[in-house]
From Swiss-Prot:
HAMAP family membership: Ribosomal_uL10
UniProt-listed NCBIfam families: PRK00099.1-1
Organism of this sequence: Coprothermobacter proteolyticus (strain ATCC 35245 / DSM 5265 / OCM 4 / BT)
Protein name: Large ribosomal subunit protein uL10
Quaternary structure, from the entry: Part of the ribosomal stalk of the 50S ribosomal subunit. The N-terminus interacts with L11 and the large rRNA to form the base of the stalk. The C-terminus forms an elongated spine to which L12 dimers bind in a sequential fashion forming a multimeric L10(L12)X complex.
Alphabetical list of Pfam families matching this protein: Ribosomal_L10 (PF00466)
Family classification: Belongs to the universal ribosomal protein uL10 family.
One function term, GO molecular function aspect: large ribosomal subunit rRNA binding
UniProt keyword list: Ribonucleoprotein, Ribosomal protein, RNA-binding, rRNA-binding
GO CC annotation, single: ribonucleoprotein complex
Lineage: Bacteria, Pseudomonadati, Coprothermobacterota, Coprothermobacteria, Coprothermobacterales
PANTHER family: 39S RIBOSOMAL PROTEIN L10, MITOCHONDRIAL
Family matches, as Gene3D superfamilies: 3.30.70.1730, 6.10.250.290
Keyword Ribosomal protein (UniProt): yes
């Protein structure tokens, strides 16, 4: 094993901790992004509860090996930054795709979802998946729809009776 200085070992430990504890993580290249745009992107991510960290590839490689992930070797080439969340597993993927549209120069290198390596191609596909809240809303709609239909069907005869009685009342009032 390569000998690593204590301060760098601390960085490797921090990276390993982020990888272990994050619900979702995207690795990306930010080559061509201005420092002003990088600061704006970090602020935007922070507002959304995400963290962006620029990392050294050699230290990232050590952390990934310690975790035991089989990743694409291209991850360790060029500039690398991490985007991760400890709360929502899909948020890093969705917000990364938004940032790609906004800045254009960002390129996905891959990601981690539920402890599994995600290729760069899969990052876009995962970003299109509905989030937890959207799935809950869809489930509520699916469950409540038959009940609403049943209520409508059962209340139909009573509603018709009320209309008939109203018509009789109006007819008697006109006759009187």
């Amino acid at each position: 094993m390569t000998r690593v200085r204590p301060e760098k070992q601390a960085v490797v430990e921090q990276l390993r901790e982020w990888i272990d504890q994050s619900k979702g993580m995207v690795f990306f290249s930010f080559e061509g992004l201005t420092s002003k745009d990088m600061q704006a992107m970090r602020a935007d991510m922070k507002r959304n509860g995400l963290t962006v960290k620029v990392v050294k590839n050699t230290l990232l490689e050590l952390a990934v090996k310690e975790v035991g992930l089989n990743v694409d070797e291209s991850l360790f080439r060029g500039t690398t930054a991490l985007l991760f969340s400890n709360e929502d597993e899909l948020a890093p993927f969705k917000l990364f795709v938004e940032q790609v549209k906004k800045y254009g120069v960002l390129q996905a290198k891959g990601g981690i979802l539920e402890g599994r390596w995600i290729s760069a191609k899969e990052v876009d596909a995962i970003a299109k998946l509905p989030g937890r809240q959207e799935l809950y809303a869809q489930l509520v709609g699916v469950v409540s729809s038959p009940m609403r239909g049943l209520v409508t069907v059962l209340s139909g005869p009573y509603r018709n009776l009320v209309y008939v009685l109203q018509a009789i009342k109006e007819k008697k009032e006109k006759a009187a």
